[in-house]
C-alpha cells in the first residue's frame, strides 16, 4: 500500500472557443500522435456540421448525446475461487463521461463516411436522438450488469 497521499483530482480545462469542458475532454480523447490542433479542427468541423444538420445549439446536442451514452453501472471481472465473475459496479459521473466519450469516438471511427468530422457529427446527432452504436454499447453494458446482478455481493 502506498504511503503517499491520494492524488488530487484535476479539474478538466475548457476549450478556447466554446469554453466547454466536454469539448476539451473530446479533443483530448480524439488526439493522435500529439496533433492537438488537428483534433481541435476535427471537433470544430463536427460542431459546425451538427449546427447545419439540427439547426439547434450544437453544444446542447453534444451534452444530450453524452448524457444519453453515459452508463450508470458497468461490469468488472473479479476472480473468485478459480472462476472469473463479471461483477456489476456503479461508476462515478467523471468515469461515466470518460467511458461515454470513448464509446462515441469508437462508434464514430467504425462508421462509414468521408472524414472524421462527418462521422463524429453523425454519431453525436444519432446519440442525442437515442440511436447509434454508442447507445447500443451502453445498453449492452447495462444488460450485462443486470444479468450478473447475482454476483453484486463480490464487490
From Swiss-Prot:
Subcellular locations according to the entry: Plastid, Chloroplast
**Entries under Pfam families matching the protein:** Ribosomal_S7
Q: Does the keyword Plastid apply?
A: yes
Keyword terms of this UniProt record: Chloroplast, Plastid, Ribonucleoprotein, Ribosomal protein, RNA-binding, rRNA-binding
A GO cellular component annotation here is: chloroplast
Identify the InterPro entries for this entry. Ribosomal_uS7, Ribosomal_uS7_bac/org-type, Ribosomal_uS7_CS, Ribosomal_uS7_dom, Ribosomal_uS7_dom_sf
Predominant location: plastid
Q: Does the keyword Chloroplast apply?
A: yes
UniProt GO molecular function: rRNA binding; structural constituent of ribosome
Q: Which PANTHER family match?
A: RIBOSOMAL PROTEIN S7 (PTHR11205)
Q: What family is this protein classified in?
A: Belongs to the universal ribosomal protein uS7 family.
Would you tell me the protein name for this molecule?
A: Small ribosomal subunit protein uS7cz/uS7cy
Q: Which gene encodes it?
A: rps7-A
